[in-house]
Every structure is written in structure tokens, then in C-alpha cells.
Design a protein with these regions (language model features):
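Short, small-residue-biased leader/transition segments that mark boundaries at the very start
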Residues: 2-7
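Conserved phosphate- and dinucleotide-binding cores of soluble alpha/beta proteins
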Residues: 12, 16-149
Length: 149
């Protein structure tokens, strides 16, 4: 909701909940959906069709969540359908990961995006100074947002 003049943008998503949230804005953006195979666990479209659709576009920014953050490896997930996340990162000029600080250190088996694919991490103020420095040392800009009660 804090995206400013989002109505001036084109937004592509594979998530119905994101699409519905964008539709509720007073001035909604041009909205594109990936299509693909519905995954009830992630409540999003996945698979080869979605990947093919994404490959035909070029995006300025990718905003993506993460199930886990591994200081050594990057973002991690339980979801084995991580091909779409990787394609999204490939077709975007800037990859911005949004994840709460408590996701750091979760031991999750699947590497989603290595730090070398990520330009910015937006997290909360609970991220320790040590973790902040270690992630920035990997070439990632880290933004700590203030937590609201």
C-alpha cells in the first residue's frame, strides 16, 4: 500500500491476493497475471506456462518475499516450485526481497535466490547489526524498517 504512484505502473503477479489488493487501490495500476498451474499451498500460479509468460517481459523491479534467509546462501523456501522465482529474478533489473528479520536462520532446504541475484533486502529493525553487516558484505543493500505495533 505504500507504493506511491502505483497506478502509473504495470504490475505482473502470480498471486490472486496481490492482484485483489491492487484492485482495491483508489487508482489501480495496469495489472497483468502470469497464468499457469494453481498451487494451493502458495496460493499462486506456478509452472512452465507462468515461466514462459514471464520470459516474454522485461521488468524494472521484482518485489519478492522469502520463507527463510540464510546469511551464507540467500533466500530459501520449502516450496520446490522455485523455478518461477528464479525466472522472475532473471527478467528483472532489480531484485528486492521483503522478509521479516525472524526469517533469518531458518534452516530450509531449497535455495531460492542466491545473494548474488539480490540487490536489496527490506526487513525490520529486529535484524541484528551483525546480520546487517554480513548481508551487506555480500553486496546487498539492507533496509531496516521500523516495526509498528
Amino acid at each position: 500500500r505504500g507504493l506511491g504512484d502505483v497506478y502509473k505502473r504495470q504490475v505482473m503477479t502470480n498471486s490472486l491476493s496481490v492482484a485483489n489488493a491492487l484492485r482495491e487501490l483508489e487508482r489501480e495500476p495496469v495489472l497483468l497475471m502470469t497464468g499457469g498451474t494453481w498451487d494451493p499451498h502458495s496460493e499462486s500460479f506456478q509452472g512452465q506456462v507462468a515461466e514462459q509468460v514471464l520470459r516474454s517481459y522485461d521488468f524494472d523491479q521484482l518485489f519478492i518475499g522469502a520463507t527463510g534467509l540464510d546469511i551464507e546462501r540467500g533466500t530459501t523456501t520449502f516450496n520446490e516450485l522455485l523455478g518461477l522465482s528464479r525466472v522472475m529474478a532473471e527478467v528483472a533489473r532489480e531484485v528486492i526481497v521483503m522478509a521479516e528479520a525472524d526469517k533469518l536462520g531458518r534452516r530450509i532446504p531449497n535455495l531460492e535466490l542466491p545473494w548474488s541475484s539480490v540487490q536489496t533486502l527490506i526487513t525490520d529493525e529486529r535484524l541484528s547489526d551483525e546480520a546487517f553487516e554480513l548481508i551487506q558484505a555480500r553486496g546487498v543493500k539492507v533496509i531496516r524498517a521500523r516495526c509498528e505495533d
